[in-house]
């Protein structure tokens, strides 16, 4: 199992969902399971279509996405980063939420998010179009997702490891490099693949998530080295 019934995906088959979580003073308390034949892309599309008003909070997104669990919420939060359009402030809020949710996955606990993050308002004018474009990409992935390479998605040890990998992606997503090409896209793809892979028991997709995490780390290391080398060159120029 991905985790015990108190937290997430009940079993490996497509279509099992979590009922809407109950909240008390900003804390997610408990969930119940039901059955749904909706695909992941259909769930995302329906949720996006339900967004109304000029702003939306993460709390409202969590209530809407509750039907298929918090791993799907992690996937949802990556959608704005799958296209080369930066929305100021979103990577910090969404990255922090992903880190806390992945911590809950690692510890096999219901996720708790601070009120400050839950109630942070996000403008829907830019968010909704990017979510729609991201959901279109997920619908293409949906055709190829299936249970395979089970050793990457089964067992308590792999659950914790995969939770840590999603957390690492959230940390990389929060790096203040939004204006640099691919700095949000690469970790976003990693988190998306990991989340969908765990939900659907697709070890190949999980392995793809590992690959993009490594690629992100290497990319950031190259950027860091380039910045350091440029700084050294400038210092030598002014000293000489």
Swiss-Prot record:
Its main location: membrane. The keyword Cell membrane applies. It is a multi-pass membrane protein. Pfam families: ExoD. One of its GO terms (cellular component) is plasma membrane. The keyword Transmembrane applies. Keywords: Cell membrane, Membrane, Nodulation, Transmembrane, Transmembrane helix. It is found in: Cell membrane. The chain crosses the membrane at residues 60-80, 81-101, 203-223. It comes from the Bacteria. To Synechocystis PCC 6803 slr1875. Required for nodule invasion. Mutations in this gene lead to sensitivity to alkaline conditions which prevents nodule invasion. This is Protein ExoD. It comes from Rhizobium meliloti (strain 1021) (Ensifer meliloti).
